Amino acid sequence: WVAEKLIMEAKKRGLNACIVRPGYIVGDSKTGVTNTDDFIWRLIKGCIQLHLIPTIYNTLNMCPVDYVAHCITVISLSSVASDRGVFHITHPKNPSFRFIDLFNSLILYGYNVTKAEYVIWRNELMEFTLQQEDNALYPLLHFVLDDLPTTTKAPELDYKNTSDIVGQECMVIDEKLMGIYLGYLVKVGFLDKPEPHDKGKVGGLEGKILDLPDIAALEGVEILKRSGRN
């Protein structure tokens, strides 16, 4: 908010400037390289540790970093961007991506997790962290226990300005792309690999379990994070 006020003031004083508002920025869509010290991936890891996923159906506006970088570059070089003012970088609305889709990807790739209502999930998480503090969500406990279905509700954003100038929609976060992200997180040791499974048995996803891709190109890649926390 403060940064946007500064940009608005700069425009008042005659400088060419615009505001770019991306959604949740996640990893590269081709390599899966992503920052692990991040709410989304901590949420995923915490659910795996708890063996539970909450049934939250809010829209999750996730955008791969390579798309966000492309948008920022094109907008920055546009001669009309300053006149447009604000640019939202969003996941496509059709099909949209929801928190439940994020969590379902864990089932799809063979993780031992079960769906539960948010209140049940929250109570189990509270009990888990009372016994031990090594859950990935422990640093964010105050947030995830504070009515996550309400606090994660997001408004619909108008991306017409971005669409007009960039001319390219964000790639859809689908099961293949989620596999790339999970594959990277396993590769760098942030997530454990799913246990061996019977491909004929999986709950709620029409009986199909996929294998995580082998991110061979990432040999020797260091884990990316903002801090020393695991």
Task: Describe the role of every protein-language-model region.
Residues 19-22, 34-49:
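Flexible glycine/proline-rich, aromatic-decorated loop/lid segments
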Residues 25-27, 94:
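Conserved sequence/active-site signature of Rossmann-fold short-chain dehydrogenase/reductase
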Residues 99-153, 172-175, 189-202, 229:
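Terminal hydrophobic/aromatic helix or amphipathic segment near a protein terminus
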Residues 1-21:
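Active-site Tyr-X1-5-Lys
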Residues 156-230:
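Amphipathic terminal alpha-helices
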Residues 14-19, 23-25, 84-88, 170:
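Beta-sheet entry/capping signal
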Residues 9, 41-54, 60-97, 103-111:
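Alpha-helical substrate-binding/gating segment
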Residues 48-56, 143-146, 163-165:
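Short glycine/proline-rich turn/loop motifs
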